[in-house]
Amino acid sequence: MKSIELLPTKENIFNTLIDDPFGRDEEMASFLNLLTTIEGHFVISIDGKWGTGKTFFIKQCELILNTINDTNKLTTENKEKILHLPFLSKESLLGKLKGQNCVYFDAWANDDYEKPILAILNTLISKCSFGKTMPSVDLTQVENLIEEMGNKFFTNKLGISVKPILETLKRPGSKEAEDQKSLHDYIEKIINNLTPDGNRLIIFIDELDRCKPSFAVKLLEQIKHYFFVNCNNKLNT
């Protein structure tokens, strides 16, 4: 028996955005417009039953934002198709969404990782790397990836080293104020790199309801603690 499930592949995300078989243009326009009107840190929850297309919805929003901000690898023809979607012009969203940078984080794919903050940092570093898409890696290699890529990129571009940060993260139960401040400073520099000229960073966190409860709670706690407390009102999730 064949499955009739439409998987959220890049091709399906693009085609359903262009053809709009689900009739979601108005909802997407309203959501994207909302992102441009609320100031400061905020969290938006997209709720729906299993199979209603939440992943499709946020990945289509991600595709639009990345296309407008020229941070994906679409062909010129496909970029033009997205940029000429009627609802973007109707709501004047092309100008409003310029500078609204975003990253996509699959929480379920990372829920066997002890420290969610490392997986999120890996996602952000990948986004920082000159718009290049980094190869997927096994979660057990995330620390090595951050150290290898982060040291090379952030030492050269931002004048900081990730090694002290990794040591902070590896110390179980480390609560020293100095360690916490170092990590806050490091994350703030990453976000500043992703949000030049006072732009905004949007993090789409998907599949949170499929995670282990302990991981979901820890993920939300670390996002609040490390991102919302000290990021200059540039972050939305």
Tell where the protein language model's regions lie, with residue ranges.
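Walker A/P-loop-proximal flanking segment of P-loop NTPase domains
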Residues: 1-92, 102-103, 118
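Glycine- and acidic
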Residues: 12-17, 168-175, 201-205
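Short glycine-/polar-rich loops that comprise or flank the Walker A/P-loop
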Residues: 41, 98-102, 199, 234-236
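P-loop NTPase nucleotide-binding core
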Residues: 55-196
